[in-house]
Amino acid sequence: MAKRVQVALTESIASLGKEGDLVDVAPGYARNFLLPYGKAMNVTPAVLKQIERKKEKEKIAAGKLKQEALDFQTALSTIGRFTIKKQVGEDGVLFGTVTNGDVAEAIEAATKKEIDRRNITVPDIHNLGAFTAKIKLHPEVNAEVNIEVTS
């Protein structure tokens, strides 16, 4: 039976785990690849303490990010409606569509807070009127904003 060696990963490796995980690997894999290339460290009590401290800091930082997202969600709901002006043809149809970038600009103008347009889901909007867009502020926090498209 082959002996296994326990190492702590210093970076994420798809076949083993993510940074900070303790994994059991073959001694040759650890000695010839993981340790020389700095992808893992031998497990010692000091390394275990370091990993634990790092995980605590990450947990606190994740809690702060979630709280910021919840606060921003509340701010978006208090504003109520965002207005986007677009050019309209004679038949009342927009020239082009309202994109997630347009919604991001409207939110940034109203809140002075930058938001990534890739986190905004906008329905196909080709007419004037009121619509709802969904925003992913955090993996656990989503918000819905009302959009009014005017000419």
UniProtKB/Swiss-Prot annotation:
One of its GO terms (cellular component) is ribonucleoprotein complex. Keywords: Ribonucleoprotein, Ribosomal protein, RNA-binding, rRNA-binding. Pfam families: Ribosomal_L9_C (PF03948), Ribosomal_L9_N (PF01281). One of its GO terms (molecular function) is rRNA binding. One of its GO terms (biological process) is translation. PANTHER family: 50S RIBOSOMAL PROTEIN L9 (PTHR21368). HAMAP family: Ribosomal_bL9. Belongs to the bacterial ribosomal protein bL9 family. Binds to the 23S rRNA. This is Large ribosomal subunit protein bL9. It comes from Prochlorococcus marinus (strain AS9601). The gene is rplI.
